[in-house]
């Protein structure tokens, strides 16, 4: 599909990701976190919102093992999952 | 011997010719300046309207921190994986689809295996369908546009961390878009070959 020819006026310009490429997890260091995340997706009918804790844990595993540049979790979109921030406060 | 009326008429003609020449020269200079200004003006126009799939200004970590998910606008994202004919990897998505909302970061996984007995370096590009939705599809981190070396018989997970811009929910052209397909294609990286960033036109 990505190799389909695009006739006419449509154009698509791929953009590099904001923070570059993930290093490869050659030794499967975060594989167990990925499996937990995938199991959650299957159990929750692939709704991303219900598995954000597992994706946060996977990214934290990568940061801890130098497989991702360290970044505050708020800047990765997990502000509402941070402890000490009740939901009502975020909605103010 | 010319009479005064004729001389005045010639002076009037000479003055009008100068005026016309001045206007023509000004128009030429103006058109030259407008052609130089067209590139930044067009880029500015595309950034504000998002036409042509150009990058929209204002995407950064600070924006991610302050995003508010639009929870009533669910979008199904499906995943596709391809390899070029000369690349002997097994490459596939690890989930068929996920349901996301604009303004919420999401994680998805691909898996790649090198079943050969020598190391292979692959490099991938991606495509988003429909194209108009591509301007709202923002990848924070993935595996594209960089060489990825797989050793013999090695298999790795390849995550994609992305979000759909909250402005997606405000765009009237996106009202009927509730399915976005993300396609990745891996190519083999040849030694010494400079791969340009591809564009489809």
Swiss-Prot record, chain A:
Record-listed N-acetylserine modification sites: 2
Pfam families: CHCH
Span(s) of short sequence motif Cx9C motif 1: 30-40
Gene: Cox19
Protein name, per record: Cytochrome c oxidase assembly protein COX19
UniProt subcellular location: Cytoplasm, Cytosol; Mitochondrion intermembrane space; Mitochondrion
GO CC term (a single one): cytosol
Protein species of origin: Mus musculus
Family the UniProt entry places it in: Belongs to the COX19 family.
Lineage: Eukaryota, Metazoa, Chordata, Craniata, Vertebrata
Biased composition annotated in UniProt, kind: Polar residues: 1-12
Gene Ontology BP, a term: intracellular copper ion homeostasis
Keywords carried by this UniProt record: Acetylation, Cytoplasm, Disulfide bond, Mitochondrion
PANTHER family, A to Z: CYTOCHROME C OXIDASE ASSEMBLY PROTEIN COX19
Transmembrane segments: none
Cited InterPro entries: CHCH (IPR010625), COX19 (IPR051383), Cys_alpha_HP_mot_SF (IPR009069)
Motif mapping: Cx9C motif 2: 51-61
UniProt superkingdom: Eukaryota
Keyword DNA repair: no
PROSITE patterns in the record: CHCH (PS51808)
Domain CHCH: start-end pairs: 27-69
Positions of disulphide bridges: 30-61, 40-51
Primary location class: cytoplasm
């Amino acid at each position: 599909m990505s190799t389909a020819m695009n006739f006419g006026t449509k154009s698509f310009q791929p953009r590099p990701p904001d923070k570059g490429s993930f290093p490869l997890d050659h030794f499967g260091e975060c594989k167990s976190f990925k499996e937990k995340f995938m199991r959650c997706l299957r159990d929750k009918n692939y709704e991303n919102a219900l598995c954000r804790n597992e994706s946060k844990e996977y990214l934290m595993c990568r940061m801890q093992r130098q497989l991702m540049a360290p970044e505050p979790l708020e800047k990765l979109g997990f502000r509402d999952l941070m402890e000490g921030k009740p939901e009502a406060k975020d909605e103010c | 011997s010319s009479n005064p009326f004729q001389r005045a008429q010639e002076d009037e003609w000479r003055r009008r010719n100068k005026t016309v020449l001045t206007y023509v020269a000004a128009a030429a200079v103006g058109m030259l300046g407008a052609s130089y200004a067209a590139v930044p003006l067009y880029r500015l126009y595309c950034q504000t309207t998002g036409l042509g799939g150009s990058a929209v200004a204002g995407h950064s970590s600070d924006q991610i921190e302050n995003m508010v998910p639009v929870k009533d606008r669910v979008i199904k994202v499906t995943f596709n994986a391809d390899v070029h004919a000369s690349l002997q990897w097994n490459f596939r998505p690890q989930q068929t689809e996920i349901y996301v909302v604009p303004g919420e970061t999401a994680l998805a996984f691909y898996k790649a295996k090198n079943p050969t007995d020598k190391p292979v370096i692959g490099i991938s590009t991606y495509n988003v369908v429909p194209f108009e939705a591509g301007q709202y599809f923002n990848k924070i981190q993935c595996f594209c546009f960089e060489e990825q070396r797989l050793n013999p018989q090695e298999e790795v997970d390849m995550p994609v961390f992305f979000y759909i811009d909250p402005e997606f929910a405000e765009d009237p052209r996106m009202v009927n878009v509730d399915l976005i397909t993300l396609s990745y294609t891996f190519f083999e990286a040849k030694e010494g070959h400079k791969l340009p960033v591809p564009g489809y036109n």
